[in-house]
C-alpha cells in the first residue's frame, strides 16, 4: 500500500493562522481503459477455435482479430498457484502458493497465505482510482479462513476488490452453489429451477459494469471474471 503522505498544511495555535491540507481523491490517467480479465478453469488454450480447436468461440476470435494471440507462456496447471501468479504478477512460490490451498503446509512457499507486501493488480488499480470487481471462483483464501465467519483479509474484498460475487473455494455445484455475495453466504438457486452459475456470474458482472458506468462515468473499472469448471 501507498505510504500516508506527510501533512502539507499548517497548524498554528489559533485556527485563523492554520491551514488545512487539501484532500484529493485518487486520480487515474486520462483515457485510462476499462479492463476485463477472464480466467477459465480446467481448459487448455488449444480447445478454442481461435487456436484451431473444436470449441467455437466467435467472441474470443473477435478480440483476437483486433488484438494479440500468445502461444508461448508458462502455467502451473493448478488452480491456486496460477491465480496467485496472475493476480500478483509474481512467481507462485514467492507469494506462498506452491500448491492449492487444500494442501497448504508450513514449509516456505506453501502456506497459502499471500503476504501483504505482494499486492494484487486489483489493489494497485484500486489505489489508482479504479472501481474493481471479482466474479466467479476465487480459490486464494487459506482453507481454514473460507468460512462465513472469516477472517476476510484474504478474501477478494480484502485484496483489492470492491465487489465480489461467486465461490470462495475450489469448486461448487453449477446448479446449487454455495456462493457468496461479498462475505455473506447466499443460495442464489432457490426458487429458480433454470438456475446456472455461469449465467448468473455473467449477469452479475454485466449489471455491475452498468451500475458503475452510470454512477461513476469518469472512473474506469477492472473486472476479474473467473468461471469455475
Feature-to-residue mapping (PLM):
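Formylglycine-dependent sulfatase
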Residues: 1-229
